[in-house]
Amino acid sequence: MKRDLYETLGVKKNADEKELKSAFRKLAMKYHPDRNPGDQEAEKSFKEINEAYETLKDPQKRAAYDRYGHAAFEQGGMGAGFGNGFAGGSAGGFSDIFEDIFGEMMGGRQRRSSGGRERGADLRYNMEITLEEAYSGKTAQIRVPTSVTCDVCTGSGAKPGTSPKTCATCQGSGRIRAAQGFFSIERTCPTCGGRGQTITDPCTKCHGQGRVTEERTLSVNIPTGIEDGTRIRLSGEGEAGLRGGPAGDLYIFLSVKPHEFYQRDGADLYCSVPISMTTAALGGKFDVTTLDGTKSRVTVPEGTQAGKQFRLKGKGMPVLRSNQTGDLYIQIQIETPQKLTKRQRELLQEFEQISSKENNPQSTGFFSRMKDFFDTLSE
């Protein structure tokens, strides 16, 4: 028993033309024989969805099907006049949508130029650099294994003194058409593999491919201020094209190593610096080494608290392709003394005894406010 045509396309019986076309496009891409070589079930499904769409997209045929079902198109049936040839104007409509749907799928044909030339594949190279290198920029030498144009046949794939011949099967188009019922399907030519040419006497070095594998050394310019995850494109430095086709591109994917002291946020840098409790209380100075190798002095005022930030203007990262520079932020961490001697402990205890609320206004105020808060709740 034949399947319901609406069920075949996966649409409701009141589906409009737009819904029918969308469903057909999706299913045709899924079951097309070129995407399922040798799969008889897929080929059967492909024929069914084409038959369903061709029927339902035509208002007269759809009306007949809605009234009589499949009997409308059977010989001698109630709607036999509609037939199964789909001749006349309807064929053009199917051809248009067929080309529209499979134009993208036949992209391999579009990538090939005359003579079976194909563009080479793009390559990816992962490079890791230091934060210092991202700061100052550099020129790096990299070695990339890739396919390059054969120097014996100059990319033609044919033995010197000979040349490729136009494929007799497809007449150089790289595609052949095969009739299937009321429509024809375009396939890759099995003789030339879609190249449009055949090589009877291939080059002995590249074996007819027009390219060979080797390792190349390339120079890569890393600009100042480059960020983690940046992609650099080297046009034409990918794999050589097949049979004299254009080369692909090489993409350098950069990653910046984590730094031992600095964290980066855009063009700004951050550094946490531990200082002693006495330096925080009495004040002091210390030097930090910036990414350009110079030293910058940071002055710590008396009574500096943990988390205090000091901004060193213009000491951050260069902004890519500009004259601007970010800032460096120094965040203070106060280190609590450990492994105290007896004398140190005595001095700290004495200091605690002679301290007043004014010496620790934040902690005194905090505990006072906490006590008042909970006292209010208990009333």
From Swiss-Prot:
One of its GO terms (molecular function) is zinc ion binding. Its cofactor is Zn(2+). It comes from the Bacteria. Zn(2+) 2 binds at C167, C170, C189, C192. SMART domains: DnaJ. One of its GO terms (biological process) is response to heat. SUPFAM superfamilies: Chaperone J-domain, DnaJ/Hsp40 cysteine-rich domain, HSP40/DnaJ peptide-binding domain. One of its GO terms (cellular component) is cytoplasm. Binds 2 Zn(2+) ions per monomer. CXXCXGXG motif repeats lie at residues 150-157, 167-174, 189-196, 203-210. Its main location: cytoplasm. Zn(2+) 1 binds at C150, C153, C203, C206. It is found in: Cytoplasm. Coiled coil: none annotated. Residues 4-69 form the J domain. A zinc finger (CR-type) spans 137-215. InterPro entries: DnaJ, DnaJ_C, DnaJ_domain, DnaJ_domain_CS, HSP40/DnaJ_pept-bd, HSP_DnaJ_Cys-rich_dom, HSP_DnaJ_Cys-rich_dom_sf, J_dom_sf. Homodimer. Belongs to the DnaJ family. The J domain is necessary and sufficient to stimulate DnaK ATPase activity. Zinc center 1 plays an important role in the autonomous, DnaK-independent chaperone activity of DnaJ. Zinc center 2 is essential for interaction with DnaK and for DnaJ activity. Participates actively in the response to hyperosmotic and heat shock by preventing the aggregation of stress-denatured proteins and by disaggregating proteins, also in an autonomous, DnaK-independent fashion. Unfolded proteins bind initially to DnaJ; upon interaction with the DnaJ-bound protein, DnaK hydrolyzes its bound ATP, resulting in the formation of a stable complex. GrpE releases ADP from DnaK; ATP binding to DnaK triggers the release of the substrate protein, thus completing the reaction cycle. NCBIfam families: DnaJ_bact, PRK10767.1. This is Chaperone protein DnaJ. The lineage of its organism: Bacteria, Pseudomonadati, Pseudomonadota, Alphaproteobacteria, Hyphomicrobiales. The gene is dnaJ.
